[in-house]
Amino acid sequence: MDSSGTVRNQTSDDHSRPADAAGTAATLYGAPAETRSPRRSRFTVRDVAAAKSRGERWSMLTAYDFTTATVFDEAEIPVLLVGDSAANVVYGYDTTVPVTVDELIPLVRAVVRGAPHAMVVADLPFGSYQAGPEQALATATRFLKEGGAQAVKLEGGARVAPAVAALVGAGIPVIGHLGLTPQSIHALGGYRVQGRDEAGEVLLADALAIEAAGAFAVVLEVVPADLAARVTKELHIATVGIGAGADCDAQVLVWQDMAGLSGGHVPRFVKRYADLRTVLGDAVRTYRDEVRGGQYPTVEHSY
């Protein structure tokens, strides 16, 4: 990682993009940091593995539409997750349980069109893979064929390892998800920290099972920081933290939370990097008032 925070790839001998002719180190996307080219290549599972081996951290954000996907891609966010959190922030459901494959695939298509450089990961929603490997493969195939996703994510530990193995065997990259798994919120009894005390050993065993099944990364959500650090050290694949401390290989947030657009309760692990809810609200109210008062449109905005 350079002084500006840019994650840099390995040399061509260790499965990464080479430096340019002048010897300038390449960025995560393969272009020199000083002269980034608009023709960046798409981030891949090999880049994730290379970052893990070099101890380089990377970021992930959710995305659900074309416009925000273009912004995140231009900002060089390497991985975009079309999460089942769309159930909450797009469709207005109370939990992630109701959202369907048919509701998510159009969102995946939009994000893929808006992000030609990021890896786009699609969440497998509740009820679309729990029946077993055959159902999981059918669902994941739809997300790749119809949505254009490059990888999928699914929740669960050892119990879903056969499904993970089936997907990987079919050539579909997989991210696991452990800890607080929102699709199981009713079984967990609410949104609370997972993996304390002896439950931490179970979580570690689940992480190892997901790795053995062939996943290239695993999300750790709302688990103690020391446990996440231990899992990260034990695994050869990347860990992606969300409320799991600072030692994970990567971090992910719901973009509306990160940018201050979400209303209501905000989890402790969220850092708001902007206050878009206030900015957008002010802009909308100003527009409303100017239309009412005849101040908009003016000659400047007329033909």
Swiss-Prot record:
Intracellular or extracellular location(s): Cytoplasm
Cofactor names: Mg(2+)
Region Disordered, annotated ranges: 1-41
Keywords: Cytoplasm, Magnesium, Metal-binding, Pantothenate biosynthesis, Transferase
One BP annotation, GO: pantothenate biosynthetic process
Annotated active site: 221
Compositionally biased residues, Polar residues: 1-10
Source species, domain of life: Bacteria
GO MF term set: 3-methyl-2-oxobutanoate hydroxymethyltransferase activity; magnesium ion binding
Role this protein plays: Catalyzes the reversible reaction in which hydroxymethyl group from 5,10-methylenetetrahydrofolate is transferred onto alpha-ketoisovalerate to form ketopantoate.
Protein's name in the database: 3-methyl-2-oxobutanoate hydroxymethyltransferase
Organism: Frankia alni (strain DSM 45986 / CECT 9034 / ACN14a)
The gene coding this protein: panB
